[in-house]
Every structure is written in structure tokens, then in C-alpha cells.
Amino acid sequence: MTGTESQATAYVTLAADHAHELEIKRSRFIAYLVRTDTEDAARAALAGLRKQHHDARHHCSAFMLGPDRQVQRSNDDGEPSGTAGVPMLEALAKRETPSGKADLSDITAVVVRYFGGVLLGAGGLVRAYSQAVSTALDGAELVRRQRMALFGITSDHADAGRLENELRSGGTTVLGTDYGPTAATLRVALPDGPDIVPAFAERLATLTAGRATALPGGVEWVDMAFGVAP
């Protein structure tokens, strides 16, 4: 693994975009949560909401991107410095997910404010923007994003069905089986990690009496519902 690759093997993100509105002292705070995996996508989401709510006073934003949450940005969009974007970013960063950790990422939060005529003060703004994002997160559907190592296993046609059944019964994700003229290739995915792959290779050798080997096919990030084993 190079220094530019992610150290994380799993994180949590949105299963679907979500929005929620709060009214605080006659100001409307509409919080949008959008799944984004690049800065360009995050800025495009913000631009779209600016256009949609062109008559609003403020369009404050915060986003966290990448499996390691290595990209974090926030913007107050005209609110007093530090009263909007930073509290929104902190609400994303500190949110504990169903994984039991604060590992939310690939998410952009935009809070659109329609000013109601009552000044909230710096403390009131911090609370309002933080609450807007936190309340929206309460109603958002989340999903676990798991890094999977892909492998191809070559087997005789006669053994392929049995091997597939035994792998599935042991909890291995079998993506499919391709039958060629002389052999079958099982495509499998394993949670990526230093201990899992060697253990699988040992299990495969036992199942096939050493006749099959797993050829690496790269890695892929996969959405997985909570409660479903990878």
C-alpha cells in the first residue's frame, strides 16, 4: 500500500440524499445532505442549491470527503466568521454512526437560511447551524462503505458448483461464476485487510486440496447495509 492510498477499509456515508427544515426565531434553516465523493461534486451540489434558493440570504456549506475524511472544507457565506460552516463541519465530524464510530464521509451539508428579521447573535447562529445539520442527520438513511479485495478462482467445471456453495456457506461473497471452454472462474470479494486474505487462501487450499489459487483482481468499494456481514 502506498502513502497515497486510504488507510481506512470502511466508513459510513449517505444511502440517499436528505433534507430537513427548521424554523428558529422566524428564520428558516433548510439543511440539505448530499452524497458526494469529490470536491467538484460537492461544489456542484452547492451551486445547484444556490440556484434553487436564489432568493435566500445565506447558503452555508461544509463537506467531508474520502475514506479517511482527508478533505474537509466549510464556508460561512456571509454569516459572521466561524458561526456557520465550522459548526456544520463539526456536526458531520462528530456524528456517531451505526458502526459505533464517528466515521461519516463523502457527504456535503448545505444549510440555506431565509432571514426572518431577528438577529440571533454569534452563539445563536452556531447553535442554529449545528442543530440544522444534526437534525437532518437524525432522519438520514446511512450505509456502510466497505473496501473489498476482488479475486478470481479457477476450478474444474465439475467442482465449481460445490466450491461456490462451500464458499457462500462460509460467508464469502461470490459475485458470480464464469464458465469457459475448459475451466470455470469464480469471482469473489473479501473485506480488504492484512489478515483476511491469507486466511482465505488457507481455507481455499483446504477446500480444494491445494488445486485452486486465488488470483488478485484489484479492490472495489461496495455499499453494504448495516447488519449484513461483508
Predicted regions and their residues:
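C-terminal regulatory domains involved in ligand/effector binding and gene-expression control
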Residues: 1-83, 195-230
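Non-DNA-binding regulatory cores of transcription-related proteins
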Residues: 2, 174-190, 197-199, 210
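Helix N-cap motif at beta-to-alpha junctions
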Residues: 38-39, 156-160, 189-197
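Glycine- and acidic-rich phosphate- and metal-coordinating loops
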Residues: 64, 104-115
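Conserved mixed alpha/beta catalytic, RNA-binding, or beta-rich assembly cores of soluble enzyme
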Residues: 81-98, 103, 115, 119, ...
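Long, charge-dense
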Residues: 122, 126-149
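Short glycine-/aliphatic-rich beta-strand segments at the starts of folded cytosolic domains
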Residues: 142-159, 186
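Short amphipathic alpha-helix segments
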Residues: 154-174, 199
